[in-house]
Design a protein with these regions (language model features):
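C-terminal motif of bacterial Sec signal peptides marking the signal peptidase cleavage site
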Residues: 14-17
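Short acidic beta-strand-loop surface patches of small beta-rich interaction domains
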Residues: 777-782
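Conserved hydrophobic/aromatic packing and binding residues within compact polymer-binding modules
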Residues: 774
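Beta-sheet-rich non-transmembrane sensory/scaffold domains
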Residues: 19-41, 46-49, 54-62, 66-752, ...
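Sec-dependent signal peptide recognition
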Residues: 2-8
Length: 837
């Protein structure tokens, strides 16, 4: 019961903090980001009022266009609402608009804008472009868009000029990557002296949250980047730097240069206040708005004790992924025109006028309304900004693919990062793959929105995936080549593989939202070296009737596909004749594999789940497949510990480690029943799987807990009269602080919550705290400050964070969990070193 009360108390504090008025940062000391689809409003100011049509609403500030003026007062009609100043637009006839046929690629901004006007005018409605490409990712995300006056709006003519942009063979498994093999004090060899990121294709690096070159380990964790020197006898945390305003999720390493790929807090308040110290945000986001922003942070590692941020590149858009090909990072982003000032009718009576107005919005739009922008900040504090891509570097597929912009930014990792070189396609992007001199980006094919059930069923039957191809042979630029389409949906990056001039794509027919009795999986072969659109040359199907794909791997002329619903058919596919691919073998076993890792030419390791004959999963299972005879694949051995555990290697291949010199496979493992969190080492030899041992991050009995400095002055709970309650609820490790109202306190390894006074009093009274004690608490909290409590993340549970990654460096197996880097000897797995981050 005491534990339950402690848990309830913790969540009650959290609810109190979250439920308080966040419009005033002094109320709780925290700042909550609004939902990105919410519409911030402002107070009407100025002498002019506005006219709003019945059934429509106008919200937010707008901008007066050059050469226009507002004459006379206007009136708000009954039943409508108006917030914010408005703009009157010049009156032009719709018949003046002349649209011309689209060009691929665009040669000028006028061509690009004409194409966008043509496609958008055909699809815009009373609710803007909402739904126009939503199924394929091409729709508009309304995020605090500005509204404009409706009554005086009709179409505008095309402007005489448009603002220009300002932006500058054999698939092989590898546990090392090109970007990690250089940069230490000695020339260590990846795959021999240390392991790198588990990548899909040899020589093509992939971003990850941890990187090493054998001499150092870099870890990006929340807003922090950590540098650990592992070149000596004892590992040393030499420096940690805060990535202020960014949440670094992945990074790429090349010598002494590190590229962190981060999300950025893209919110600007109505008063122009920015939620972070990132100066680029205020240049990209209008007051009262939110945008999805991605930042590339270049870090100089030459002085391990003094890491320096050299250059940052902040761009509008969502980060998809990145690859390093031919010495350059190819960073894939997708963005949409988020702030076109559409109106939305409050009822059906206003739909016709709203549609007319929204067509006008399309007609008056400029290139900057559609394409993403960027801000580059150099180490000396100078800024460069503009459109991320020039108009003549934008293309569109021959089939309309929505209004999103899929951009590939090329970054030379051997030189300081400058203004971006970008190529873009008017399409969305979800899954990327690189191989054979090309980068591929796959996404759901665009379809117009549907309303009735029969249309949904038809859409499911015709579900398709679009694939966009880019040439990456030039280290200084990425070039769009063409696009193609395959039926069904892909699982992940392993669904694609280029080999000998052909792209092989594995898909399950229908949409990704469940099982269909008539569904099946197919492998489609596309010609990849034509220099034009991807064209189908062969296909094989009828795999996994009523099932869907759970794992795919291509190795040379062979493909492996796992489907699952109740059992696990493991298929072998002969792709030696691209025009006539053939399913050669099928092995049915219980459970499934979620990740396939080729060991050599004849063995494949599958990491997944054991299951009953009815398909109910039972816990982690590792299977060793013999594929020496494609007509008769067999399962040589399995490892299944039971207990309902799982491994993140099932869905994130970077969590898997294969160390060939010792025939050792290492994977994270969590057993939710027992609470175990470990890394399991398995020896794969002589057709068997043998567990060597397990590594965990439980503190040793003689291990000192890392000291964490509280961010605010601490206060003795005894002074608050909370000591008895604290001990009774086993909260003896809690930290109480008095923090300024405008701060958001954080402590490594702790959950910190501001205690809003009224809610706190309600909870305290319910726990029996006397009014005298509550009065004492009130007197001890000075004006302008707030009471904050920080509870250890592992309190009450003896919980340890799951191990996320493992590395081999020299004679040690290194493992990483949140806040901790640990070394265990490869021989015996005894713990040899611990670094608390």
């Amino acid at each position: 019961m005491r534990r339950l009360i402690a848990i309830l108390l913790t969540f009650a504090f959290a609810a109190a903090a979250c439920g308080s008025d966040t419009t005033d940062p002094g109320a709780s000391g925290t700042t909550s980001l609004p939902d990105k689809n919410s519409i911030p409003t402002t107070t009407t100011s100025g002498p002019a009022t506005t006219t709003t049509l019945p059934g429509t609403s106008t919200v937010g500030p707008t901008t007066t266009l050059p050469g226009t003026s507002t004459v006379g007062p206007t009136t708000t009609l009954p039943g409508t609402s108006t917030v914010g100043p408005t703009t009157t637009l010049p009156i032009v006839e719709l018949g003046d608009l002349m649209f011309v046929s689209a060009l691929v690629p665009f040669t000028a901004c006028d061509d690009l804008l004409t194409y966008l006007w043509t496609e958008a005018s055909a699809r815009v409605g009373p609710y803007g472009l909402e739904g126009a490409g939503w199924y394929g990712g091409g729709g508009i995300l309304r995020s605090g868009v500005m509204r404009m006056e409706v009554d005086d709006v009709v179409a505008m003519a095309m402007p005489d000029s448009v603002p220009m942009g300002g932006g500058a063979e054999d698939p092989t498994v590898a546990q090392a990557s090109v970007g990690e093999a250089d940069g230490g004090s000695s020339n260590l060899e990846a795959g021999v002296d240390f392991s790198g990121t588990n990548v899909q294709e040899l020589g093509i690096d992939e971003p990850d949250l941890i990187k090493t070159d054998g001499n150092r380990v870099l870890i990006v964790e929340d807003q922090w980047l950590h540098h650990v020197d592992v070149s000596g006898g004892t590992a040393v945390l030499t420096d940690s730097i805060e990535l202020t305003g960014h949440w670094g999720s992945e990074m790429l390493l090349d010598g002494d240069r590190l590229l962190v790929l981060a999300q950025t807090e893209g919110w600007v308040g109505e008063d122009g206040s920015v939620g972070s110290e990132n100066a680029a945000v205020s240049r990209l986001v209008a007051p009262g708005h939110y945008k999805s922003l991605t930042t590339l942070v270049e870090v100089d590692l030459s002085d391990p004790a003094d890491l320096q941020i050299d250059n940052t590149l902040t761009v509008e858009g969502r980060y998809v992924s990145a690859r390093v090909v031919n010495g350059a990072a190819r960073v894939v982003l997708t963005s949409g025109p988020e702030q076109l000032p559409f109106v939305y009718p409050q009822n059906s009576a206003g739909e016709e006028r709203a549609t007319e107005f929204n067509r006008q919005i399309i007609a008056e739009s400029v290139v900057a309304d559609w394409l993403p922008s960027y801000v580059h900040e150099a180490a000396d504090g100078t800024f460069t900004d503009g459109l991320l891509v020039d108009c003549d570097r934008v293309s569109h597929p021959t089939e309309f693919a929505g209004f999103s912009t899929l951009s590939v930014v090329t970054v030379d990792l051997s030189a300081p990062m400058v203004a971006p070189d970008t190529t873009s396609v008017l399409a969305d992007g979800e899954t990327i793959y690189a191989g054979g001199g090309h980068l591929y980006v796959a996404t759901t094919s665009y379809v117009d929105p549907v309303d009735d059930e029969s249309s949904w069923e038809e859409m499911d039957r015709n579900y398709a995936t679009s694939i966009h191809q880019f040439r990456v042979s030039d280290p200084t630029a990425t070039v769009y080549v063409g696009s193609g389409s395959v039926p069904g949906h892909v699982l992940n990056q392993f669904s694609m593989s280029e080999h000998a001039g052909y792209l092989r794509v594995a898909t399950t027919l229908g949409g990704p939202w469940g099982f269909r009795e008539e569904s099946e999986s197919v492998v489609t072969v596309l010609a990849a070296d034509t220099g034009e659109d991807l064209v189908q040359v062969g296909q094989v199907g009828e795999m996994g009737k009523g099932e869907r794909i759970y794992a795919v791997r291509f190795v040379g002329d062979v493909g492996y596909v796992v489907t699952f619903r109740q059992t696990d058919p493991f298929y072998t596919i002969d792709l030696s004749d691209p025009a006539n691919p053939v399913v050669r073998g099928e092995l049915k076993i219980t459970g499934y594999s979620g990740y396939l890792h080729p060991i050599d030419g004849d063995l494949v390791l599958g990491i997944g789940q054991e299951a009953t004959e009815t398909g109910r999963t039972m816990g982690t299972k590792v299977t060793l497949f013999d594929v020496s005879d494609l007509d008769n694949p067999t399962a040589l051995d399995t490892w299944a510990p039971g207990g309902g555990g799982s491994s993140s290697a099932e869905w994130d291949h970077r969590a898997f480690l294969w160390w060939a010199p010792l025939d050792l496979a290492v994977l994270p493992f969590q057993d939710w029943n027992s609470g175990e969190a470990a890394a399991v080492a398995l020896r794969i030899a002589d057709g068997t799987i043998t567990e060597v041992g397990r590594v965990d991050h439980l503190p040793a009995s003689d291990e000192e807990e890392p000291l964490v400095e509280p961010p605010c002055p601490t206060i003795d709970p005894g002074e608050l009269g909370l000591d008895e309650i604290q001990v009774g609820l086993e909260l003896d490790r809690a930290v109480y602080m008095l923090c300024d109202e405008d701060t958001r306190p954080e402590m490594k390894g702790f959950w910190c919550q501001t205690l809003e006074q009224e809610a706190f009093f309600d909870i305290a009274e319910g726990l029996g705290v006397s009014p005298v004690v509550l009065q004492t608490i009130t007197e001890l909290v000075p004006e302008g400050q707030q009471l904050t409590t920080c509870l250890p993340e592992d309190y009450e549970y003896n919980w340890t964070p799951p191990i996320q990654r493992t590395l081999v460096i020299g004679e040690d197996l290194w493992s990483y969990s949140y806040g901790r880097l640990q070394a265990n000897a490869l021989d015996g797995l005894d713990r040899t070193d611990v670094v608390n981050l």
